[in-house]
Regions:
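Core segments of alpha-helical transmembrane spans in multipass integral membrane proteins
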Residues: 15-25, 39-63, 74-81
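Non-cytosolic membrane-interface motifs at loop->transmembrane helix junctions
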Residues: 37-43, 96-106
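Short, charged juxtamembrane terminal tails flanking transmembrane helices
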Residues: 1-2, 123-128
Length: 128
């Protein structure tokens, strides 16, 4: 992947991580105690983990050449939207998106798995 794309994706991952941290902070003060707060906490935690996958993947894409990087980023983004998004909505009393949660969870797992495959099977770009 071209370096400028890796840098752009790295910036997106860092921005999403900041948003996850902000969501966690806001949720701990604004969401009522109980199941709603637990759902919000879980959403922000996995939002952060998926953002971290994007950050790590973007850095690794600068070191190993592979065609798997973009799908791994896509899966992480879909995972954040579906898994964390459905839990954020659930904590606000909106349960219509609940069926998307498992899909999002699988996408986050797929993202991490693809990162591992890209590193294992990718060509090291730092060697001459």
């Amino acid at each position: 992947m071209k370096e400028r794309y890796s840098k752009a994706i790295l910036s997106i991952g860092c921005t999403l991580a900041v948003l996850a941290l902000m969501a966690g902070a806001v949720g701990s003060h604004m969401v009522e105690e109980g199941l709603a707060r637990e759902a919000f906490k879980t959403a922000s935690t996995y939002h952060f983990y998926a953002s971290l996958a994007i950050v790590i993947g973007a850095i690794c894409s600068m070191l190993w050449q592979s065609s798997i990087w973009l799908p791994s980023f896509g899966f992480a983004l879909i995972g954040i939207a579906c898994f964390s998004g459905s839990l954020y909505l659930k904590s606000l009393g909106i349960t219509d998106a609940a069926p998307l949660g498992p899909v999002g969870g699988l996408c986050i797992m797929a993202s991490w798995g693809l990162i591992a495959l890209a590193v294992i099977g990718g060509r090291n770009t730092t060697r001459n």
